[in-house]
């Protein structure tokens, strides 16, 4: 059995729900269970979530092999434990406070920046990207012979979180140690270091996203998800030639947000 949700029509005259409706009810129940566990920290496996975070840097394929195992044992691709999301949120809060400190922001400015980053950059943009990728993958990437299967929205969101974590660590943590004394010095070395960190971070996001969708056996042509590497490398080269410092732009944007 392919690890996905079957959507074959099984409508009967006796009023029994077809498989599509049943899948929706099942998805709703799983979503409710996931949200309920957000407030039950003792039920979360933080050790396993931390292990996943480590392997997203060293061997992201191993993380997606665990998604296969979850599908076989719990009949769903998406995580049923919000521990990863909780740890990611903690990382995001701590690193954003660090950004506020490095940019010499006051207490209330840092809190305002934190709300912007968490609610808009992480949650809002994350929901938008997950929904877009969920639609594209189901609309254009499902194999013709596998039309009875679809990508779970929760899985699309998990793929985004997986890809977002390395980007967060590189741009919101590692970069902090270089901002004031290297990156923002308005020199070639400054924007070389800063823009290279951006190249690695965004490249990681693209690659981990590709791995997430290529792990689904009922999808085709997932290699197209690697195509953004071409404009990314082109943009990187142009930025060095034109002296465009991505991190300087980000810092200016953050300061503008909290005015």
Curated annotation (Swiss-Prot):
Residues 1-82, 137-163, 209-222 are cytoplasmic. The modification N-acetylmethionine is found at residue 1. It comes from the Eukaryota. Residues 104-115, 185-187, 244-259 are lumenal. It holds the Pfam family UNC-50. The chain crosses the membrane at residues 83-103, 116-136, 164-184, 188-208, 223-243. The keyword RNA-binding applies. Involved in the cell surface expression of neuronal nicotinic receptors. Binds RNA. Belongs to the unc-50 family. This is Protein unc-50 homolog. It comes from Homo sapiens. The lineage of its organism: Eukaryota, Metazoa, Chordata, Craniata, Vertebrata. The gene is UNC50.
């Amino acid at each position: 059995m392919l690890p996905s949700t079957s959507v074959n029509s099984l409508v009967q005259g006796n009023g029994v729900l077809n498989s599509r409706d049943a899948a929706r009810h099942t998805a709703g129940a799983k979503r409710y269970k996931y949200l309920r566990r957000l407030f039950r920290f003792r039920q979360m496996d933080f050790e396993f979530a931390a292990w996943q975070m480590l392997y997203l840097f060293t061997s992201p394929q191993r993380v997606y092999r665990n998604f296969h195992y979850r599908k076989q044992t719990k009949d769903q691709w998406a995580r049923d434990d919000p521990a990863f999301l909780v740890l990611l949120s903690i990382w995001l809060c701590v690193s954003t406070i660090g950004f506020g400190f490095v940019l010499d922001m006051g207490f209330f400015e840092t809190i305002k920046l934190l709300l912007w980053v968490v609610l808009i950059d992480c949650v809002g943009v994350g929901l938008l990207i997950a929904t877009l990728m969920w639609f594209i993958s189901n609309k254009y990437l499902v194999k013709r012979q596998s039309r009875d299967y679809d990508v779970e929205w929760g899985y699309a969101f998990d793929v985004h979180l997986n890809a977002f974590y390395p980007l967060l660590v590189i741009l919101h943590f590692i970069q902090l140690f270089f901002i004031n004394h290297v990156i923002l010095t308005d020199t070639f070395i400054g924007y070389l270091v800063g823009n290279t960190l951006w190249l690695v971070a965004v490249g990681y996001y693209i690659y981990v996203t590709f791995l997430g969708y290529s792990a689904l056996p009922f999808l085709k042509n997932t290699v197209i998800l690697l195509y953004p590497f071409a404009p990314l490398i082109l943009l990187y080269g142009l930025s060095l030639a034109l002296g465009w410092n991505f991190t300087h732009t980000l810092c200016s944007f953050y300061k503008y947000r909290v005015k």
